[in-house]
Curated annotation (Swiss-Prot):
Zn(2+) 2 binds at C816, C890, C897, C900. It catalyses: RNA(n) + a ribonucleoside 5'-triphosphate = RNA(n+1) + diphosphate. NCBIfam families: rpoC_TIGR (TIGR02386). InterPro entries: DNA-dir_RpoC_beta_prime, DNA-dir_RpoC_beta_prime_bact, RNA_pol_asu, RNA_pol_N, RNA_pol_Rpb1_1, RNA_pol_Rpb1_3, RNA_pol_Rpb1_3_sf, RNA_pol_Rpb1_4. It comes from Neisseria meningitidis serogroup B (strain ATCC BAA-335 / MC58). The gene is rpoC. The keyword Transferase applies. The RNAP catalytic core consists of 2 alpha, 1 beta, 1 beta' and 1 omega subunit. When a sigma factor is associated with the core the holoenzyme is formed, which can initiate transcription. Belongs to the RNA polymerase beta' chain family. Binds 1 Mg(2+) ion per subunit. This is DNA-directed RNA polymerase subunit beta'.
Length: 1391
């Protein structure tokens, strides 16, 4: 390091200081003066003739330093030998001109001025400290009122406002007994005379005595600010400024343009205004001008300083000559173009270039093709060095010349330099860490970068004109990291789900599929071959075809006990293509993996298996060979598309006719009044949806089979070799949905709002569309395009918020030693096991022993990482649930431990210390978001909606069980009618494991009994999907109450049918105010005309009709249990797609309270209903001890419980979306985590995107990182404040050690934006959002940033404390501790 110091004249001692934290505070006037090198007295900038700075002006050389290196302004002293001399003529110190970037000046203000950030940044800090409203403070500051600063012996109050008239009246009355001031002086006086310590005492006492919640909150806020001031030793009056610092001139440059004009930074304008007004005010004060004039000038000065600090925050923004607002100091640092995001977090780097990408099908996975021109430019310094070293050039200049002339030696040297020097390729947008990968460059001619096709999936690149950037790692360490961590061949698995991301697609898949398909009766069928070489010869001499079925002897390599490979020879029935493919299989991969037609999914499985069985190196080589082979056979196969390949099924006409007939029938029923218009629409849409599916099925059946003659001469079906079918079937391109549009029928289309147009497009693209059909189609297709453009931005913003909330989460230790965890079960939805238990626990660490349910022996001990082998064993033993460790319950303070996180998905083993798991989680969730937004636009607006379900069927054999919430009654026909709201039928297999779980809606008819044995395919329950019934649980005679035509119900006569029905009117729409409160209800009478009561109570049965219900019973009608009283038509369905998805994910992570949230029971107890109020019902839950909890529920909402029902705490009692905050409060962290994980996964699953639960849990951990102090105990916290969980834990441990009372706290769920802003690091929060507010708050609190996260370290320009940087930080920390210890020891010896 000493050598460097010689060459760096600025390197005075102490420039290289190491620091461990950054503290922010309010600068005192003394501090500001100590920074300054002189006072700026004049608004002049530079002399426009000589271009020299004016003295005492904004660019003064005397204050800020010389304009030219080592040269004073008048030119008396020049050169290095006068370094440090101050010229006696012009007063300029002879030194480097770059001091003009760091020397500050100051302006002495003639009157104090309030700092706008402390005044206007909400909540107003000045207002908080003084306990005055913002409006009042502004009136004082801007000279509209006086404030009493010292009431003396008068009855006036301190801080009381007086208008001018009041003030003069009081002056007459009391004379000089009191003091009142105007402007910033008045506020400053109030601040100066406030006794902080005393005020804190008073507030603490008030806190204990007061009972009102709002008051507690208000006092706690004020207390926090005052305590911060008290602790940090900052004075309150520093929020009012006497001195204004002036930014160094080179940071607000003035550049002469040609033509005698100047380009200047807006700050100079703002400073000029301040100086002008300040000087004018000084003169006015010297002249003893009248009060009113001085006041006006002071107000103008205040406004000028406001504009300089934060233009436009108060009043109108100051504008320059061109009418746009001037850019103030605050604007310089905030927003996307501000200092934080533009310059500190987003730097541009040298040694980089970009170019278009093309395919490099002959490359190996770790290589890329780099154009010679680019390489020459990028590796210049290395080439210069080599040229000098070999003596071809004596100076850098000479070397430069040689390179420019491109002499032959230069190319040889370039080859040498480039060898084994990895470069990094990046494609924007970089959505996850695989968006930048390292490759070894291969020099190529031309100007395009060649990219290996298999990494396209990771970069999301295609070759339609995409560009990529190249970066060169310079230092040895950087090259090493690029090679070991970032080389493409080291990134085979995706960090999001642990599956291979190096997976063949498109042509490669098509080639491999074509190669491994079998043909019936191909040339040479049934031949026997001794080995693969023989197959080769036969194929090349055209004795056999690629798809010929043959028998062949193959040698495979199998591991023995010792783990060494041994050859095993087997005979296989296979095809020629598969036998040829067997040659490239790595050792240890069984042939049966390729002995089938390889589709995209199969190939992915193949690569996965290869990675697990044969390791990384072999897999990479294998993937490359797969690619070469695939491309080769895709070329030989000659698969193309012709119009004739789109075969239209013969059954189409019949199916359309059938659908038309059904629609006609529904229309007839509608005319007769048997169905409402809404039901008609729903049924029509369903019919067309089904017809489309049937045609699609007929088409696919037709496409996928073709008739051929086999060897015996019989006609048989074989899988088709239709090009379009092969493309879709192999997964290379296209899907059944797209083929359906080509040769089936286009089907139903959606309007831009998502509702479905009921007339479908019956033609397909091959037949062509009529004008009307074409118009309907464009409707949806254009929406797709518009959506994509709009949604990409949203998705990027979601990723940004996620990264920001998790950026400081790093694995810092091996094991935190907790035994907490979550219990994992398989995810069962509808009839299917959506995610098996094995997939959910793979790569996790067990939190408790896993015990075999049948034998009771321990299968896996606690603390074991679950590998594929162990998971399979658990799966076979029939274990239903496993308790695993999770990031949410990890006890590590700052960061995570490896055991709670589990396996590093991209590497396949336990995660290493230093892995930035937070950022990986954020990227894994954010990256598919962008993909999902683009997915919609490819199908082109075709409606994708499942026909509404009207029944559930069992999918497997077993025993039917009813869930605990199941309630049903038997009606007169003997059918079981469900009357519970959240009922489920669960099916268990013979061992008793849950296999299926089906929701059955209210009003469904059950076709099975509890405990009944059932077969697969048996219907369990049926219901009407389009209406929701209202069912009676008691029998009797109908008696209506408040069912008055024209008041509470309307008689609706259908124009088409002439039939009338009674429909309940919405209370808000009713005419008279009295009728708004009436609720149409139905009561039941027995044969004597007495009201029937609920059994066991004296409450009469009374059921209210909901709004919009169509009443189906008449007054006086006899009804039995389970009969339908009314039908509520369901709204028509819309198409579901990721639009519902992305905002849904954002909503979950932002922890927003849903619009019409449902309600959960606060306590466990019995439900009863109390006295109703206007428009609300009173629901009461009484627990065992008789404590009642009551709540009012608006009548529009659907209550899911009934009188006398027992509910558990946290059970849903009012229908609606669940509020996550309620789940956390009533059911705890595990239930909350399960809810969020499930909901987020559902969105992604709908799109077929796999993300590990782990990543979502990491984010939930960050959302739960703060807690609310419920009772501070004897710790230093304030009751009601929000603090980091780790801080409370630490404080409680300390309190318990000292025998004090620990604090009690409640969990809080914060949305990701809020969590990012409430982080302890103010640098991280300020660079995220609301910069002004964050910095203001931090300055007042005198916050210290410990630089723990990644972001803060990037901003201060250090290695990040993750990955290889973690060791650097740790060693520094250790050294620091050792130094501290030494100093402590020396002090002891000194004493």
């Amino acid at each position: 390091m000493n050598l460097l110091n010689l060459f760096n004249p600025l390197q005075t001692a102490g420039m290289e200081e190491e620091f461990d934290a950054i503290k922010i505070g309010i600068a005192s006037p003394e501090t500001i003066r100590s920074w300054s090198y002189g006072e700026v007295k004049k608004p002049e900038t530079i002399n426009y003739r000589t271009f020299k700075p004016e003295r005492d002006g904004l660019f003064c050389a005397k204050i800020f330093g010389p304009v030219k290196d080592y040269e004073c302004l008048c030119g008396k002293y020049k050169r290095l030998k006068f370094k440090g001399v101050t010229c006696e003529k012009c007063g300029v110190e002879v030194t480097l001109s770059k001091v003009r970037r760091e020397r500050m000046g100051h302006i002495e203000l003639a009157a104090p001025v309030a700092h706008i950030w402390f005044l206007k940044s909400l909540p107003s800090r000045l207002g908080m400290v003084l306990d005055m409203t913002l409006r009042d403070i502004e009136r004082v500051l801007y000279f509209e009122a006086f404030v009493v600063t010292d009431p003396g012996m008068t009855p006036l109050q301190r801080r009381q406002l007086l208008t001018e008239d009041d003030y003069y009246n009081k002056l007459d009355e009391y004379g000089d007994d009191f003091d009142a001031k105007m402007g910033a002086e008045g506020i400053r006086e109030l601040l100066r005379t406030l006794n902080v310590a005393g005020e804190i005492e008073i507030l603490r006492q008030e806190l204990e005595s007061t009972g009102s919640d709002t008051k507690i909150k208000k006092i706690a806020k004020r207390l926090k600010v005052l305590e911060a001031f008290h602790r940090s030793g900052m004075k309150l009056e520093w929020m009012i400024m006497d001195v204004l610092p002036v930014l160094p001139p080179d940071l607000r440059p003035l550049v002469p343009l040609d033509g005698g004009r100047f380009a200047t930074s807006d700050l100079n304008d703002l400073y000029r205004r301040v100086i002008n007004r300040n000087n004018r005010l000084k003169r006015l004060l010297e002249l003893h001008a009248p009060d009113i004039i001085v006041r006006n000038e002071k107000r103008m000065l205040q406004e000028a300083v406001d504009s300089l600090l934060d233009n436009g925050r108060r009043g109108k923004a100051m504008t320059g000559a061109n009418k746009r607002p001037l850019k103030s100091l605050a604007d310089m640092i905030k927003g996307k173009g501000g200092r934080f995001r533009q310059n500190l977090l987003g730097k541009r780097v040298d040694y980089s270039g970009r170019s278009v990408i093309t395919v490099g099908p002959y490359l190996r996975l770790h290589q890329c093709g780099l154009p010679k021109k680019m390489a020459l430019e990028l590796f210049k310094p290395f080439i210069f060095h080599k040229l000098e070293k070999q003596g071809l050039a004596s100076t850098v200049k000479a070397a430069k010349k040689l390179v420019e002339q491109e002499v032959p030696e230069v190319w040889d040297i370039l080859e040498e330099v480039i060898r084994e020097h990895p470069i990094m390729l990046n494609r924007a947008p970089t959505l996850h860490r695989l968006g930048i990968q390292a490759f070894e460059p291969i020099l190529i001619e031309g100007k395009a970068i060649q990219l290996h096709p298999l990494v396209c999936a990771a970069f999301n690149a295609d070759f339609d004109g995409d560009q990529m950037a190249v970066h060169v790692p310079l230092s040895l360490e950087a090259q090493m990291e690029a090679r070991t961590l970032m080389l493409a061949s080291n990134n085979v698995l995706s960090p999001a789900n642990g599956e291979p991301i190096i997976v063949p697609s498109q042509d490669i898949v098509l080639g491999l599929y074509y190669m491994t398909r079998d043909r019936i009766n191909a040339k040479g069928e049934g031949s026997l071959f001794a080995d693969v070489k023989e197959v080769h010869r036969a194929y090349h001499t055209k004795q056999v075809e690629l798809g010929t079925k043959i028998t062949v002897r193959l040698r495979e390599w199998v591991k023995n006990e010792a783990g060494e490979f041994e050859p095993v020879v087997n005979r296989y029935e296979t095809t020629v293509g598969r036998a040829l493919l067997s040659e490239i299989l790595p050792k240890g991969l069984p042939f049966e993996y390729v002995n089938k037609a390889l589709k995209k999914k199969e190939i992915s499985k193949l690569i996965n298996a290869s990675f697990r069985l044969c390791g990384l190196r072999d897999t990479v080589i294998f993937a490359d060979h797969l690619m070469y082979t695939g491309f080769g056979f895709a070329a030989k196969g000659g698969i193309s598309i012709a119009v004739d390949d789109m075969e239209i099924p013969k059954e189409k006409a019949a199916l359309l006719a059938e659908a038309n007939a059904e629609v006609k029938e529904i229309e007839d029923q509608y005319r007769q009044g048997l169905v409402t218009n809404g039901e008609r629409y729903n049924k029509v849409v369903d019919i067309w949806g089904r017809a489309g599916d049937k045609i699609a099925k007929a088409m696919m059946d037709n496409l996928s089979k073709q008739k051929v003659i086999d060897r015996a001469g019989n006609e048989v079906d074989q899988e088709s070799f239709n090009s379009i079918y092969m493309m879709a079937d192999s997964g290379a391109r296209g899907s059944a949905a797209q083929i359906k549009q080509l040769s089936g029928m286009r089907g139903l289309m959606a309007k831009p709002d998502g509702s479905i147009i009921e007339t479908p497009i019956t033609s397909n693209f091959r037949e062509g569309l009529t004008v009307l059909q074409y118009f309907i189609a464009t409707h949806g297709a254009r929406k797709g395009l518009a959506d994509t453009a709009l949604k990409t931005a949203n998705s990027g913003y979601l990723t940004r918020r996620l990264v920001d909330v998790t950026q400081d989460l790093v694995v810092v230790e091996d094991d935190c030693g907790t035994s907490d965890g979550f219990v994992m079960k398989a995810v069962v939805q509808g009839g299917d096991v959506i995610e098996a238990l094995r997939d959910r626990i793979l790569g996790r660490v067990t939190a408790s022993d896993v015990v075999d349910p049948s034998s009771g022996e321990t299968l896996v001990e606690a603390g074991t990482l679950l590998t594929e082998k162990l998971v399979d064993m658990i799966d076979q033993s029939g274990v239903d649930e496993v308790k695993v460790r999770t990031p949410i319950t990890c006890k590590t303070r700052h960061g995570l431990c490896a055991h709670c996180y589990g396996r590093d998905l991209a590497r396949g083993k336990l995660v290493n210390a230093g892995e930035a798991v937070g950022v990986i989680a954020a990227q894994s969730i954010g990256e598919p978001g962008t993909q999902l937004t683009m997915r919609t636009f490819h199908i082109g607006g075709a409606a994708s909606r499942a026909a509404a379900a009207s029944q559930v069927e069992a999918k497997s054999n077993g025993t039917a069980r009813f869930s605990s919430q199941m309630r049903y009654v038997a009606n007169n026909k003997g059918e079981l009618v469900v009357i519970g709201r959240s009922c489920e039928v669960v099916i268990h297999d013979d061992i008793g494991r849950e296999r299926e779980r089906h929701k059955v809606p209210y009003g469904a008819i059950l076709l099975v009994q509890d405990g009944m044995a059932i077969k697969a395919g048996q219907t369990l329950a049926t219901w009407d999907p389009h209406t929701r019934p209202m069912i009676t649980e008691h029998a009797g005679m109908v008696k209506f109450e408040n069912v008055e035509e024209g008041v509470t119900v309307a008689k609706q006569t259908d124009d088409v049918t002439g039939l009338s029905t009674l429909v309940v009117i919405d209370g808000k729409r009713r005419s008279s105010s009295a009728s708004k409160l009436l609720r149409p209800t139905v009561k039941l009478l027995d044969e004597n005309g007495v009201e029937i009561c609920i059994p066991g109570t004296s409450t009469p049965v009374s059921m209210a009709f909901p709004v919009g219900a169509v009443i189906t019973v008449r007054e006086g009608q006899e009804i039995g249990k389970g009969d339908v009283l009314a039908r509520i038509p369901q709204a028509s369905s819309k198409t579901r797609d990721i639009t519902g998805g992305l905002p849904r994910v954002a909503e979950l992570f932002e922890a927003r309270v849903p619009k019409d949230a449902g309600m959960l029971a606060e306590i466990t107890g019995t439900v009863s209903f109390g006295k109703e109020t206007k428009g609300k019902q009173r629901l009461i839950v009484t627990d065992v001890d008789g404590v009642a909890y009551e709540t009012l529920i608006s009548k529009e909402k659907q209550i899911l419980v009934h009188d006398g029902q027992v509910v558990n705490r946290g059970e849903t009692i009012v229908d609606g979306a669940v509020d996550p905050h309620d789940i956390l409060r009533l059911q705890g962290i595990e239930a909350l985590a399960r809810y969020i994980v499930q909901e987020v996964q559902e969105v992604y699953r709908l799109q077929g995107v796999k993300i590990s639960d782990k990543h979502i849990e990491v984010i939930i951990r960050q959302m739960l990182r703060r807690v609310n102090i419920a009772d501070a105990g004897e710790t230093g916290f304030i009751t009601g404040e929000q603090v980091e969980r780790g801080d409370v834990m630490a404080a409680n441990e300390k309190a318990l050690e000292e025998g004090k009372e620990p604090a009690r706290y409640e969990n809080v769920l914060l949305g990701i934006t809020k969590a990012s802003l409430s982080t302890d690091s103010f640098i991280s929060a300020a660079s995220f959002q609301e910069t002004t507010r964050v910095l203001t708050e931090a300055a007042i609190m005198g916050k210290q940033d410990e630089l723990r996260g990644l972001k803060e370290n990037v901003i201060v320009g250090r290695l990040i404390p993750a990955g290889t940087g973690l060791t650097y930080h740790r060693s520094r920390h250790q050294q620091w501790q050792e130094v501290e210890q030494e100093t402590a020891e020396t002090q002891v010896t000194d004493e």
